[in-house]
A protein has these predicted regions:
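Proline-centered linker/hinge motifs at extracellular inter-domain junctions
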Residues: 1, 231-235
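Exoplasmic/lumenal beta-rich domain surfaces
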Residues: 3-66, 263-288, 293
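Surface-exposed, short loops/turns at beta-strand junctions within beta-sandwich domains
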Residues: 66-72, 219-221, 291-299
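Short beta-strand elements
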Residues: 75, 83-109, 315-322
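Conserved structural position at the C-terminal beta-strand
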Residues: 80, 304-306
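Proteolytic processing hotspots in large secreted/extracellular or virion-associated proteins
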Residues: 102, 108, 112-117, 147-194, ...
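Proteolytic-maturation and junctional protease-sensitive modules
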Residues: 169-225, 264, 273-274
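Short edge beta-strand/loop segments characteristic of extracellular beta-sandwich folds
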Residues: 180-184, 250-258
Length: 322
């Protein structure tokens, strides 16, 4: 719990005793998200953003804004309390400066503003973005630019467009925005084309499929994007010795992919579909034998097909003996 007082008058309280699963992302509005991402510390806003729910704020007077008159002094106290009742207090005094010392900014009539209560769309060059109402928690200045793609990419990843910047990666989104980038892609690469997300000079898989000359992606992360193609199929590594009788109740495979990650997998024994259990943390899949369907002392044809998120496929087919 965090409380704020101005001259002993409570003007703000944040209290989160629990919330529904679908309210989880409102935590990005409770915090100052860019500062929190940059510092890896919890940074709490002592106000409520327009797009945040009221449930977390039992006390909120005038959005907790300080509005003293010229020359007026106020005593501010901030209390932070953990779940065990331990409390820290910060106190300081503020004084309203003369009006001539107030900050004044020159209005930029060319600036684009995203109203968080209304949908927003923008196209610049080959990149466009659509932001539905309610995606952002507050109005934002919109920025979009492009530049040559100069970053470290794996040799197996082909970069097929300039780099397009749409706002920043530390802009929190409550729901998804849609990013579309047009690019010429050779026909043989089109089934394997997607969007890459670039941060700190490295490209990672973002998603989306190439269709009608463009890649479209639904995303909760904005920042730097480019069109890329990945043509390297995933690797299948059996965790048992192929060709030797299998004496265990189960068999395990390790799946690896160079860029986009594993998209799907399926397996058959003598043409009959079998159940696989995936362990994403270890990058493995496991099949446990059913003695009634696959008795011991017989040989079977096992076929495992693995496809990555860019449509590259690997087939592992062997005869195994129980």
């Amino acid at each position: 719990r965090i409380r704020e007082f101005a001259d002993e008058d409570p003007i703000f309280e944040l209290r989160i005793d629990g919330f529904a699963f679908d309210q989880t992302r409102y935590c990005n509005a409770v915090t100052h998200y860019p500062m929190q991402v940059a510092s890896r510390n919890e940074v709490i806003r002592l106000t409520r953003l327009d797009g945040c729910i009221d449930d977390f704020y039992p006390v909120l007077k005038n959005q907790a804004l300080l509005t003293p008159s010229e020359g007026q002094s106020q005593q501010i106290r901030i209390e932070a309390e953990d779940d065990s009742g331990n409390r820290s207090i910060l106190e300081f005094r503020t004084i309203r400066q003369p009006a001539q010392r107030d900050f004044r900014a020159v209005c930029d009539s060319t600036a684009l503003i995203v109203d968080n209560r209304r949908p927003f769309s923008h196209t610049a060059g080959e990149a466009s973005v659509h932001i539905p109402a309610g995606v952002f928690y507050e109005p934002l200045f919109f920025s979009q630019s492009s530049r040559p793609a100069q970053f470290a990419a794996a040799p197996s990843v082909a970069v097929l467009s300039p780099l397009y910047s749409i706002l920043d990666y530390d802009t929190p989104l409550h729901t998804a925005a849609t990013v579309t980038i047009r690019a010429y892609v050779p026909q043989n690469l089109q089934p394997h084309t997607t969007l890459g997300f670039v941060r700190k000079g490295k490209v990672s898989y973002a998603g989306g499929k190439y269709k009608n000359g463009a890649v479209t992606l639904s995303t909760r992360t904005l920042g730097d994007f480019c069109v890329v193609a990945d043509t390297v199929p995933p690797r299948i590594e059996p965790r048992f010795k192929a060709g030797e009788p299998i004496r265990t109740r189960s068999i395990t495979f390790r799946l690896r992919d160079n860029f986009s990650g594993i998209g799907s997998y399926t397996a058959t024994l003598d043409g009959e579909w079998i159940l696989l259990e995936r362990n994403p943390m270890q990058g493995t899949i496991t099949h446990t034998f059913d003695d009634s369907r696959t008795p011991k002392g017989r040989s079977y044809t096992l076929q495992l097909t693995v496809t990555d998120n860019c449509g590259n496929k690997t087939v592992w087919k062997r005869t195994i003996t129980r």
